[in-house]
Structure formats: C-alpha cells, structure tokens
Amino acid sequence: MKTRELILKLFDEAYEKKTWHGPNLKQSIRGVSAKQAAWRPGAERHNIWEETLHAAYWKYTVRRGIEGGKRGSFALKGSNFFPRPEKGRENEAAWSADRKLLEREHRALRKTIEAVVDTPRGRKFLRKIYGVAFHDVYHAGQIRLLRRLMGH
C-alpha cells in the first residue's frame, strides 16, 4: 500500500469508515442527545459535547498548519476545549450545529490532505496528519466510556 492510500485509509477509518477496533469518532457521537452530550462524569470534567468540539478544533489546527493559514480563524472563539453547552443553548439545535462543525472541519482537512499528501509539504506534515487520526480514535474511546458511565 502506498503512503497516500495508507494515510487516507487511517484518516477515514478514525472518523467514519468501518474499523476492526470498534466505533470511530462519528459512530461514537451518533444517537447522542444534547442532554447526554452535556452530561459530565464529575465537576471540571469534559463532556461528549466538549470532546466533539475539541476534535473539530484540532482538525482545523492541523489543516491551518498545512495550508499556512492565519491563527485565530476557527469558527469559535477560543482554542482547544470549548465549554458546552452554552447557557441558554442546552438544546438539540446547538448540539447539531456543533456536530456539523466537526463534520465541516473533517471534510476540509481531508480535502487538504488529498491535495498535499504526495508533495514535499505533505510529507513534512505526515506525523500531524496521522496524529489527527489517532486523536480521533482516542477521543472516540473517551466518548464511548462517557456513554457507558451514563448508562447509554
């Protein structure tokens, strides 16, 4: 298998394609309600909603690095973890909007990876590219654990 094929396969499996290791990131948030996404296992602990946006942010960060984009251009103000739900927005529409942000950032990064993976610039970023796939799998596992802890 060529590097291009392997990288795209890893990237796709970590987010949405069938895998041998269990649910990927997209499968892990499927069927989760806003109320469930907002549940915390304890004070000062992240919830599913925050983990979802965290994954979106790091997809953006890797893409921005590859493209040489401007810092601070993420759709949300802040970085890394975003407190959710926002006061007065503890609803399905807000949760759906944030899931769509994850999807958009994933699609944008995949498009960038496809364009550069075979170039010298792409090779320079290979570690971050496969790293973001591992990051998705890591957080998919956290989300699955949170779902079990809440009995879902």
Regions found by a protein language model. Give the residues of each.
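Short, contiguous alpha-helical
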Residues: K2-R4, L8-G22, K26-I29, A34-F82, ...
